[in-house]
Amino acid sequence: MFAVVETGGKQYKVKEQDVIKVELLKAGIGEKVLLKSLATFNNDGSGSFSASSGSVSAEVVAHCRSDKIIVFKKRRRKNYRRKNGHRQNMTVLRVVEVR
């Protein structure tokens, strides 16, 4: 059985025992979090698309930061160059149960 969950404005396809990286959640390591399920499916492909029909229970494994992305802006012939980096704070979750 798998589900499509939404957190941080993004959607993830998960099944039990999956480990996913999501945007930072305010939960401590080892805590359980409940993610709302947009759709749940059985292994044969049948399922429901109701948001109220299911939920996904996950455990916080760790907090980390994503890889750095470089933002470089330049205007040719004007000696205008700006270089910035960004690292997003992430939470690593292990899916415990899909309901």
Curated annotation (Swiss-Prot):
GO biological process entries: translation
Transmembrane segments annotated in the record for this chain: none
Example of a GO cellular component annotation carried by this entry: ribosome
Assigned keywords, A-Z: Ribonucleoprotein, Ribosomal protein, RNA-binding, rRNA-binding
Entries under InterPro entries matching the protein: bL21-like (IPR028909), bL21-like_sf (IPR036164), Ribosomal_bL21 (IPR001787), Ribosomal_bL21_CS (IPR018258)
Family matches, as PROSITE patterns: RIBOSOMAL_L21
Complex and partners: Part of the 50S ribosomal subunit. Contacts protein L20.
Family, similarity comment: Belongs to the bacterial ribosomal protein bL21 family.
Described function: This protein binds to 23S rRNA in the presence of protein L20.
Name this protein carries in UniProt: Large ribosomal subunit protein bL21
